[in-house]
Curated annotation (Swiss-Prot):
It is an enzyme of class 2 (transferase). InterPro entries: Phopholipid_MeTrfase (IPR007318), Phosphatid-EA_MeTrfase_fun (IPR016219). The gene is CHO2. This is Phosphatidylethanolamine N-methyltransferase. Residues 1-49 are annotated as: Disordered. The keyword Lipid metabolism applies. The chain crosses the membrane at residues 94-114, 118-138, 202-222, 230-250, 280-300, 307-327, 385-405, 413-433, 460-480, 491-511, 569-589. Coiled coil: none annotated. It comes from Podospora anserina (strain S / ATCC MYA-4624 / DSM 980 / FGSC 10383) (Pleurage anserina). Catalyzes the first step of the methylation pathway of phosphatidylcholine biosynthesis, the SAM-dependent methylation of phosphatidylethanolamine (PE) to phosphatidylmonomethylethanolamine (PMME).
Amino acid sequence: MSTTTAIDDPAGLKTTRQRNNQPQQSEIPLPSPSISDVDSDSNKGDDHRDAHVKKAYGRTPDGTGMHTLLSPSQTHDMVSQLLDPREPKNLSDYIVLGVLALHIWLAWAVPAPYNKYLLGFAFTFWRLAYNAGIGYLLTVQSKYTLLVTWARRLRAFEQPATNPRPWLYNLLKTELETKIPKDYKMDEAPIEYNTWLAFRRIVDLILMCDFVSYCLFAIVCAHTPEDEGLGMLLGRWVGGIALVGFNLWVKLDAHRVVKDYAWYWGDFFYLIEQELTFDGVFEMAPHPMYSIGYAGYYGISMMAASYDVLFISIAAHALQFVFLAFVENPHIEKTYNPPPPRLRAESEIGSQTEADALVTKELNGNSDIPQPVHNMIGSFDLFRVTDASSLIIVACFIALTVVTPTTRTYQTLAVVNAIFWRLWYSVGLGYILKKQSEKKMYTRHFLKFGESTGEAWRQWKGLYHISMILCHVSFLTACWKMYTYPEDWSYGSVLLKHVIGVSLIALQLWTSSSIYESLGEFGWFYGDFFFESPRPPTYNSIYRFLNNPERVLGAAGFWGLALITWSKAVFVMALVSQLLMLGFISFVEKPHMQKIYGQNLRKEAGLTKFVKKSLPAPVKRWQQGVDKVLDETKHFAEDFIDAALTRLSAGSSNFVKDTTALFHKPLRLSINRIDRDLAGYDPKHYKLSVEGEQLIAPDEKATRKESADARVPKDVKTKVFQYGAPIRVKWTAPANHSKKDWVGLYLVTDNRNRDFTEVPSLGRWIPTCRGQYDTTTDEGIVSYDEKVKSEGVEGPLVQGEMVFEGDKLWWTQGVYEFRYHHHGKHNVMSISEPFEVRIPLVVKEGTELTIEEAENALLPIVRNCLDRDPEIAPETVDEPWGAHVERDGKYAERVVYAIREMFAIEFSPAVVPADGNVKKLAWRVVNGRIALAPYSMSLQSRRPPTPVADSYK
C-alpha cells in the first residue's frame, strides 16, 4: 500500500528502496524470507512488502517499547471474499453487497440524465472517502497510532467480563474469525493486528463502491458518436479493451507480489520481518499502481466515448497522486528510510554529497569553508545576474510575441528563432561539452586568464541555464504564434487533442523534476565533465526504470504542444528537438559516460530487463540476433562518421522547478465554547507554576535609557527563559478533576478572555493524565495525580508535572502563558504567570565578533533548536548534526531565526544542512558580518546614551 523509493545502486541490481529493519529490541530470532515490491490499493502504492511464503513474522510495538512477536494469518483479497461462494460470508460482506446492489438499482431505476448525475456524485463521494477519508485515518495512525488508541479506549477487543460494550466484542469476534477460520483467534492476537483486520472491512466497502460506481457512471454515459466510422469504432474498443486488460494484469501481478499485507496498508499497524526484492510490475514504472495502474480508467473512457468519463477519470487519477504524496510517501520515509545515526567525528561529516564536496573544494580551495547553497535551479534570485538575465529574456520574448501581429512573416520568424535556439542549445552546447570531455577546452580557457576551475564551472552553469531558457521560451512563443483558439470545442477531436497535449506536457515536467531530483545540481549541469566523479553512477528515482529517460520522455511536452496547436511547423520543431536530443545522448553523453565510468555502467534498465524476461524463448533468440546486427551496424556508422567529419552533438535538458509542498498540520483540539459540567469545580483550587532555564537576571533589565528611578533595581518577578529550552509546568487540581483536563501554551496577546481560550493550541498542549488522548500527546507527562497536602482547602488535591519541549514550544520570541483547561474543552481553570522567551543579542550591529565568540554563543542555541536530541544535536562545535536537519526543514528555520536575532544577520535555511556543524556556521556568521561592516547603519557604538536629568527624580 505504499510507494517505492529507490536507493543508490551502482550495479543496477538492487535499485529499490532499501528497507531498514526496526531496532532489535528483542532477542527473539526471526526468519527473514525474501519479499517483493509492494503496492497499495485497489489502486494503491507500490511498496514491495509481502512475501512469497506461507508464513510471515512481524512485530507490533507494545506499551513498554518492546515488540510482540506475531504470526499474521492467511487472508484473501476482497473480490474473492465478496464474490466467491466458497468463501465464508458475514454481516459486513452482506452490507457491502447490499450497497453495491443499491448502486446497480439506481443506475437502472433512475431515468436519464439524472442517473448520470447521481452516479457521478456517488463516485465522487466514494473517491473522496478513499483519498480523504482513508487518507486521514492512515495519517493519524502513522503519526499518532490513533486507530489503535481508539480501539484500546473503546475496549473493543477485551473480553465481555471487562468490556463495557460486549455487543461490540461479539460482533467483531464473529466478523473477524469468520473471515479467517483456520489460524486466527481474536483474543490471542495483538490489538494492532485486530485493528488492522477491522480497518480492512471499512476499506473493502469504500474500494468496492468506488470501483462499481465508476463503472456504472461510465455505462450510463456511454454512447456512439455521430458519424463515427467503423475504423474509429473498432479502434476505440480494441484500444479500450487492451488498456483495461493491461490494467487488470498490473493489478493481478501487483497482488501476486504484495499480497494483502501491503494491499491494506498493513505496515501502518505492524511490520513484517522481511527484506525487499525487485520483481514483476514494479520493474516497469515508478509507482506502478498510481501510474500505469490507472490505464484502465482511460480504456473505459475510450469505450464509453464520453468526455465526462474522461475528465472524472483524470480527476480521480490526480487524487491518487495527492494521496501518494501526503499519505504514503511520508509514512514510507518515516518507517523505512529513517535518518542515519548522527556522526560523531568531524572527518565523518556527511551533510554534503561527495560530488558537492569536490566542487566546494575546487571553488574555495579550503574544505573547512562552507559550501555554496544557492542552487541555480529552484532558487530564483533577482540579485543574481543569471536569474535577472533570464527574467529579462522571458519578458522580451513575451512582449515581442504579444505586440507583433500574427501574420505568416512573424510566424515564420518565430519558428526560425525557435529552431535556431534549439540548434544552439543542442549542437552548440554539445560541441562545448564534447571538447570539454576530450581536452578540457572550456576549463583551459579560464585557466589561461588566471581564473580557477570553480570560475569555469560557475560560468558554464550560467551559460547552460540561460541557453535552456532561450530554447524553451522560443519554442513556446512559436507555438503561441501558430495556435488558433478553437471556435467550437466539441468539433471533431479538438478537446481530445488538448487533453492529450496537456497530459504530455505534464509528463515532461514530471520527467524533468525526477531527473533533477536524482542527479542534483551537479548532474543537471553535467558536473562530471568538469570534475572527476568521486563515485560510480547511481540508478535511483526515474533512472531505476530507464537508462536515459530524456530519450523517451524528455520531448513529450514538445509533442503535446504540437497536438494542441495542430500545426505542421510545430510538428517539425518537435521532430527536430527529438532528433537533436537523441543525437546529444549518442554523441556527447554516452561516450563521456563510457570514458569515465567504463564497466560500472548498467547494461539494461529495469523496464528493459522486465520486457526481455517476459518474451517467449523464440522471440528472445530473434531479439538477440537483431541486437547483434544493430551493434555491428552502429560500430560501422560510428567509424564512418569519425573518419568523415567532426562529430557535432545535440542534446536537451528540460527546465524544471522542483517544488514540494508538504503541509504538516499539528494536532488540534476542537473548540467548544460552552461546558455544561463546570458545577462543583472551583478555579481557586487550580494552580500552575512554571520553571525553565533563566536567560538573564532581573537587575540586568535596567539600561541607561530609563529615568533615574527606573534604573534602580527592582524586585522584578517576570521570568525570561532561553529560546528553545524545555519548560517544566507543575499543576495542582482537585482530586476529582476531569481526566481529560489539559494544559496549553499561548502568547499572552492571543487571548483577550481570561475565562475562555479563543484560539486553538496548534499542537502546543499536553493532557494532565495519560491514556485519555492518543499516545503522542502523552509525551511530556512526567507525573500526574499525585496526592498533596491541602491545608485550608475543602477536599483533597492532586498535582502533576509536564515538560514542554520541541514541537510543543513556540519557536518565536514573545511573552507567553500556560492555561489549564477543563475536560477537553477551552474553559480556563487557571493561568500561569506570564514569562518571556528571548534570544540574547550576542553582538550589536557595527561591533566586532570573533569566531570563538560566535561558536560559544551558537552551540547552546543550536542544541536547543535541535531539541537537544542526542541523535541530532552536537555536543561540540566540530561535531556534525544529524541527518534529520536535512530532512526536516523546521530545524534549519529555527537556527536561522536565532542567528538573525543574535547576530543581526540573515541566512537562508539551506545554509544550515549545508554547513553541517557549528564551526562552519560560526565562520559564515563572522565573515558575513565582516562583509556587512562597511555598510552598517548602527550608530550605537559612536553615540552617547540618552541623557537623563537628575532633577526629574
